[in-house]
């Protein structure tokens, strides 16, 4: 059952960060910005954190460094050069990417900067060969108006995208260099969003502005939406990787639910008098208790020479199993923290289970000398690994006493979230010394401002008013980026309603039968040209497009001729209709014009795609009158 929250009284604050790839060359070299699967070379690196310009080290970077992983990079000579293996300084930023960033700045009601200064953002998870990402502010102080009020856009940044992850491992990660350096626009809002639906409206507005440029990439992985969510008494949580617009409200609702439940746990721990110093780093070796266990997981660990270690969590019983999101508990949060070392954990609130018996549970309780409200957590692994995992669990338990820890979390498909790493600090940036400041001239700003593309929603409204087409058709044309083609067809003399119907309804319907991706804009324009020249009927379009999807090497005219879809002359059509009327003369004489429907059905069965429906109607009517007068 969906829980309704009073977001105003909860003090909900949400900010968005939207990242979208630009469809230009790479940001700091002229190689193509395309993904590929061909690997020509590989190399290995290890990365270390450095101090920011303030002399501080970012905690998220430090935590990644402690994992001690090596990074293997796969490259292709066509899509990677020396810049992106960090063996050559960056070239000057791509001019087209800068112009698109400036367009987006104006579309979001923001003010462009006078000079673009690139900075280095420390990233040592392996996704950047150099250990940093280059980023620059191009616009500031934009805004989005919503029914709940205005939401600010303090910064619009142009940056380089990271490598593509191929394989993650405990000791090694493999990345592909093809995505590294693809220009990325990053748009951040102020935390002035106070309702989940408001967040969706803001995200759509920004997405529409990006699409209006016609210079953003489409498809899986080209857009990444991050949320920053907090409530009164809770903490700021960064949620990464929200893919679908419709999931934004769901994820926010679930995060509010999670924080409220964590605050309930905090309150209960305070009632029980738990203090951080009560949670001691004392590991208990309980391996002997499980020597004859029925748990397959534990038995496998013991067979490999591993151990079963336990820690005591005073007064946590009943709270580790407390549900904080649908299907997720405080114990799940603890397990997420331990996952960098072990696959899973066992805790008292879920036992007996997983082959662990009540007798084994009782023995652990006795060994740890647990009281009525005390809990334990078990880990099965090599001794040192088990200790590392239990330290993570102990840290998460200490954080539970304070309520909601600040974290970066991963969005899950069901709307829940999962721990990724500590929230990055501000100690991540330092100046980029290889790229001089870029002056944004008044002439360039004026040129961009005077040639801004039409905003998508304004275009939808114009289509409805000017071309008298249904709003849902107009919206789909714009959302699917078929609007330019639509306007070209109208310029050819095609009726707007027909053009919209074919582009939206017919072609989408064909997707169920054939791969419409094979149908090019040239195919579509050529087919409509045949229609405009009265060489085919509009009824023939669907069959022509279906055949072109199967055989894209053919032309629309070839298909029309091969399939016998070219229009018959009026005389040929009249002759066929007269034959149909003669075959049904008794019905015609009996019903007169009442036979119109039946005759039209039979005529169209023979003439569909070979004659215009309007002409067929006129000639059927004419023949009925001739034979009944």
Curated annotation (Swiss-Prot):
It holds the Pfam family GatB_Yqey. The keyword Ribosomal protein does not apply. PROSITE patterns: GATB. It catalyses: L-glutamyl-tRNA(Gln) + L-glutamine + ATP + H2O = L-glutaminyl-tRNA(Gln) + L-glutamate + ADP + phosphate + H(+). Transmembrane segments: none annotated. GO terms for molecular function: aminoacyl-tRNA ligase activity; ATP binding; glutaminyl-tRNA synthase (glutamine-hydrolyzing) activity. HAMAP family: GatE (MF_00588). This is Glutamyl-tRNA(Gln) amidotransferase subunit E. It comes from Thermococcus sibiricus (strain DSM 12597 / MM 739). The gene is gatE.
């Amino acid at each position: 059952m969906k829980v309704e929250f009073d977001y105003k009284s909860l003090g909900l604050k949400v900010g968005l960060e939207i990242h979208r790839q630009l469809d230009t060359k790479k940001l700091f070299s002229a190689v193509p910005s395309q993904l590929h699967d061909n690997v020509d070379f590989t190399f290995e690196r290890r990365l270390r954190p450095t101090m920011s310009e303030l002399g501080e080290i970012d905690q998220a970077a430090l935590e990644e460094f402690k994992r001690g992983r090596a990074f293997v990079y796969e490259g292709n000579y066509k899509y990677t050069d020396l810049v992106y293996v960090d063996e050559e300084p960056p070239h000057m930023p791509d001019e087209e990417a800068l112009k698109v960033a400036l367009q987006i700045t104006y579309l979001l009601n923001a003010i462009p900067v006078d000079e673009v200064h690139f900075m280095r953002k420390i990233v040592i998870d392996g996704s950047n060969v150099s250990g940093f990402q280059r980023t620059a502010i191009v616009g500031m102080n934009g805004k989005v108006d919503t029914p709940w009020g205005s939401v600010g856009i303090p910064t619009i940044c142009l940056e380089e995208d990271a490598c593509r992850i191929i394989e993650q491992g405990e000791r090694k990660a493999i990345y592909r260099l093809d995505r590294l350096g693809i220009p990325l626009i990053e748009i951040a809002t102020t935390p002035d969003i106070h309702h989940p639906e408001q967040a969706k409206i803001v995200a759509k507005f920004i997405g529409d502005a990006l699409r209006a440029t016609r210079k953003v990439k489409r498809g899986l992985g080209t857009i990444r939406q991050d949320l920053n969510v907090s409530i009164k008494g809770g903490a700021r949580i960064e949620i990464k990787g929200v893919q679908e617009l419709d999931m934004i409200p769901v994820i926010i609702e679930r995060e509010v639910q999670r924080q409220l439940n964590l605050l309930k746990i905090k309150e209960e721990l305070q009632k029980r008098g738990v203090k951080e110093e009560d949670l001691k780093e004392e590991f208990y070796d309980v391996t002997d208790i499980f020597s004859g266990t029925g748990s397959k997981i534990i038995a496998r660990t013991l067979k490999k020479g591993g151990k079963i270690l336990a820690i005591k969590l005073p007064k946590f019983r009943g709270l580790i199993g407390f549900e904080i999101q649908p299907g997720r508990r405080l114990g799940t949060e603890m397990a997420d923290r331990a996952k960098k070392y072990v696959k899973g954990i066992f805790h008292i609130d879920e036992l007996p289970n997983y082959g662990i018996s009540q007798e084994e549970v009782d023995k652990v309780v006795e060994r740890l000398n647990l009281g009525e409200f005390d809990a334990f957590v078990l880990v099965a692994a090599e001794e040192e690994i088990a200790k590392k995992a239990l330290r993570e669990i102990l840290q998460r338990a200490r954080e539970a006493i304070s309520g909601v820890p600040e974290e970066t979390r991963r969005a899950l498909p069901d709307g829940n979230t999962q721990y990724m790493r500590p929230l990055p600090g501000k100690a991540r940036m330092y100046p980029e010394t290889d790229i001089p400041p870029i002056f944004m001239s008044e002439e360039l700003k004026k040129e961009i401002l005077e040639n801004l593309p039409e905003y998508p929603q304004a275009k939808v409204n114009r289509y409805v008013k000017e071309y008298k087409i249904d709003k849902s058709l107009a919206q789909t044309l714009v959302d699917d980026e078929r609007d330019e083609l639509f306007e070209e067809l109208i310029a050819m003399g095609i009726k707007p309603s027909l053009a919209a119907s074919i582009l939206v309804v017919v072609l989408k319907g064909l997707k169920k039968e054939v791969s419409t991706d094979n149908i090019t804009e040239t195919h579509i324009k050529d087919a409509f040209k045949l229609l405009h020249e009265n060489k085919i009927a509009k009824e023939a379009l669907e069959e022509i497009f279906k055949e072109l999807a199967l055989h894209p090497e053919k032309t629309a005219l070839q298909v029309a001729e091969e399939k016998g879809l070219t229009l018959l002359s009026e005389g040929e059509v009249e002759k066929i209709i007269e034959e149909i009327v003669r075959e049904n003369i008794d019905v015609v004489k009996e019903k007169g014009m009442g036979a119109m429907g039946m005759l039209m059905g039979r005529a169209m069965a023979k003439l569909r795609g070979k004659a215009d429906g309007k002409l067929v109607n006129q000639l059927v009517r004419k023949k009925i009158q001739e034979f009944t007068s």
